[in-house]
Amino acid sequence: MARKTPIERYRNIGISAHIDAGKTTTTERVLFYTGVNHKLGEVHDGAATMDWMEQEQERGITITSAATTCFWKGMAGNFPAHHINIIDTPGHVDFTIEVERSMRVLDGACMVYCAVGGVQPQSETVWRQANKYKVPRLAFVNKMDRTGANFFKVYDQMRARLKANPVPMQVPIGAEDSFEGVIDLVKMKAIIWDDASQGMKFEYGDIPEHLLADAKKWRENMVEAAAEASEELMNKYLEEGDLSEADIKAAIRQRTIASEIVPMMCGTAFKNKGVQAMLDGVVEYLPSPVDIPPVPGLNEDDEPVVRKAEDTEKFSALAFKIATDPFVGQLCFIRCYSGTLNSGDTVFNSVKEKKERIGRIVQMHANQREEIKEMLAGDIAAIVGLKDTTTGDTLCDDKAIVVLERMIFPEPVISQAVEPKTKADQEKMGLALNRLAAEDPSFRVRTDEESGQTIIAGMGELHLDIIVDRMKREFGVEATVGKPQVAYRETIRKVCEEIEGKFVKQSGGRGQYGHVVLKIEPQEPGKGFEFIDAIKGGTVPREYIPAVEKGVRETLTSGVLAGYPVVDVKVTLFFGSYHDVDSNENAFRMAASMAFKDGCRKASPVILEPMMAVEVETPEDYAGTVMGDLSSRRGMVQGMDEIAGGGGKIIKAEVPLSEMFGYSTSLRSATQGRATYSMEFKHYSEAPKNVIDAIVTSKAPK
């Protein structure tokens, strides 16, 4: 099947924002304008499009789509139709894993900022992730009609807090109640949108007299930014004092894709002003799949390879989100990086090393879902019926195996026991938790062997609250939750040169005999567990060595101090002995386990606790109180910045997670509700002796 839209006219973008910047309204307006311009029914001549809103109303649930496809021909109908996939990115820091996931499959992003609130802490987290994945972006300053709106303040904050290089492509006409429209600095015209048509119509007008000098200053700033794209343009600019519209747009596009600049626009999504021009900006300045480097991966032999965004290349795709639809089952959203995929194909999941059959392929639109027969390079769609694929897996052609990314998911730092309220909820709860764990790799479920309780673990208190809330909302399961528990770890600090483990039972008949000598030493943080076989002369036969490693690995799950998992140790097996008749795998497994436990006791065991990076935004009057409170929680205050544009302080600190429970309540009461905070996991560090003693005592058998 031939392409309907050439890949150069594809844009895979995310709309990303802090919680209150108005992302939802902005996205809704994007879907409204693009949907009106392009009636889906016409394109496919009565192809089966199933109305998705009706289903939602019948079921009373809302399915938020992880990726929505729409088309845009330009505010003035001046472009051929562009195929835009909008990937949803959550705004909360507990879901940074979700943001990372979506950043991975984006080619560009629109960062939405509130004209009043400006750049918030979460905006910084998202910005850092966009830097990490080198995502070109443009900025849209929303809510220009709100009291206190100030476009230029946001410009200053982007420079100060994000160290960004924003280039306004527009400046506002008025602000707050008097916000009328924008000045297009490329055309040097005012754009005024028509209220009656909900912003569908607009007209170009002359720039208001009192704004002309300002507009000229900002235009010069923009043209200079464009001229820096190449020596040739710089010379042209120096000779002629200006650049043509085509030159400016091409140069701004080039520098945006190289992540050197961030074009800035503004408007108010709620009042239907500005989003239309932002969509034009997406088409004009953000990259298509072929404007960015081909996707890197590893082949079967772990050698680096790339996959070009071409239909003729071998098929490769990344699963970036699993969503559960109670009626269709699991939807797996994938981004096709290269090649083509047809419904009915069998593909290879190179992470799980299993084959998967592609059932139906569906594309989500603003108010309907459409079944498509094939996906091409650059496409994003959802697949129904995958059995083993989870977030972060690669799907590829089994004759050209590639792994696009080894997803590294953070280990959960907090856990809670959950119990169903009634017997009837018991089975439903298990099902619900497994479904939710399949969707979100940073959320884990396990059963505590001693108490038989179900334990859920995640990235923060809010993360687990939302999981419990979703169980109730989507699966109808009422549950009670226990007190949050911190995920401590254990490690050792000294080397234990030689520790012996002997497991012998020889009392007649078939006996048991296993004997090992191990060296146990600490590794640098994050290095994990390493097992080295240094047996010389067959003192432990080859066939028993895996059993020795297994014995040590099984013991790692429960440390000697308080039963927490042991991390960052290196174990070397260098000597042992065996019995021709009585030795077996089980005996060596037991001997290794005993030796490792003994060795850990002698190697100065310690407990590690998760440390969180905490950022508090507070009015200046309360800064001292906040810092004192963080210090009393064993926090290390690492610095204090001004909130850009005045209005308070940002305090950055590193605080143990165990001291942060209930922090939001105490921060609220200490600052009369005027301070906000965000926190994310930073690293594990050794707990002080008094804390270790308290943990050990609390875990001791009563």
From Swiss-Prot:
It is found in: Cytoplasm. Residues 8-290 form the tr-type G domain. SMART domains: EFG_C, EFG_IV. Keywords: Cytoplasm, Elongation factor, GTP-binding, Nucleotide-binding, Protein biosynthesis. GO terms for biological process: ribosome disassembly. One of its GO terms (cellular component) is cytoplasm. GO terms for molecular function: GTP binding; GTPase activity; guanosine tetraphosphate binding; translation elongation factor activity. It comes from the Bacteria. InterPro entries: EFG_II (IPR041095), EFG_III (IPR009022), EFG_III/V (IPR035647), EFG_IV (IPR047872), EFG_V (IPR035649), EFG_V-like (IPR000640), EFTu-like_2 (IPR004161), G_TR_CS (IPR031157). GTP binds at residues 17-24, 88-92, 142-145. The keyword Nuclease does not apply. Catalyzes the GTP-dependent ribosomal translocation step during translation elongation. During this step, the ribosome changes from the pre-translocational (PRE) to the post-translocational (POST) state as the newly formed A-site-bound peptidyl-tRNA and P-site-bound deacylated tRNA move to the P and E sites, respectively. Catalyzes the coordinated movement of the two tRNA molecules, the mRNA and conformational changes in the ribosome. Belongs to the TRAFAC class translation factor GTPase superfamily. Classic translation factor GTPase family. EF-G/EF-2 subfamily. This is Elongation factor G. It comes from Janthinobacterium sp. (strain Marseille) (Minibacterium massiliensis). The gene is fusA.
